[in-house]
Design a protein with these regions (language model features):
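Terminal, non-catalytic protein-protein interaction segments that mediate quaternary/complex assembly
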Residues: 1-208
Length: 209
């Protein structure tokens, strides 16, 4: 927070999520770029949720929805969108619903449909990124390919406020030896995170993953 106050740059974005906010002073932001930090232990997570007492309940329900396997749904291949976790912080999330759904959910991104070599999209066939990464880490613990992308190439078509695009870029998992012990590391790259509204939740959800 001190870094943001002392070194942050003032920015005036013209769009926020899927909203046009040009000229709206409420959205003027103080921003820190290329900021890196390292957590070696989480400690008491209560400090991540000071800004909103509902956040702890929300992240627990949101995490369940994120890792839900669509193949376990009564309607096979059915992703969770919008789910019910958003109702815990309804004032934060409801404004971004479009025709009763979000432009994307993490459940859709962690277990996604795929496009074949002919450009045909197969949303009815699930590519389970969580399982693929887990299996590769077991097969090859020294891998540098255990990456789960959240921001997909097609998101570039919707920048500028046409649709919401993920604030998370990817999760990169590495198993490396530190002080004689093998440890699982996660590198979590975000293009943006509201420090008050979302940052603590993002940290906790990445840690649980």
């Amino acid at each position: 927070m001190r870094n943001c106050i002392e070194m942050g740059a003032i920015v005036r974005p013209k769009s926020y999520q899927n909203k046009n906010i040009e000229g709206q002073e409420d959205y003027i932001t103080k921003e820190v770029i290329c900021h890196q930090y390292c957590l070696t232990s989480l400690g008491d997570p209560k400090w991540l949720f000071l800004a909103d007492k509902r956040s702890k309940q929300w992240v627990e329900e949101e995490f369940k929805e994120r890792i839900h396997d669509p193949l376990d749904s009564p309607d096979k291949f059915s992703h969770i969108n919008p789910g019910s976790a958003f109702l815990i912080r309804e004032d934060v999330w409801r404004p971004f619903l479009v025709n009763g759904k979000f432009d994307y959910t993490y459940n859709e991104r962690l277990r996604f449909g795929w496009t074949d070599s002919k450009g045909i999209n197969h949303q009815d066939r699930i590519w389970d990124a969580l399982k693929a990464v887990r299996d590769e880490l077991i097969r090859n613990p020294d891998t540098r390919q255990a990456v789960i992308p959240i921001f997909h190439p097609t998101d570039v078509k919707y920048i500028g406020g046409e649709r919401r695009v993920p604030c998370s870029m990817y999760y990169d998992f590495l198993i490396r030896e530190i002080k004689g012990k093998k440890r699982l590391h996660i590198c979590y790259h975000q293009r943006s995170s509201d420090f008050v509204t979302h940052f603590g939740n993002d940290v906790y959800l990445a840690w649980k993953l």
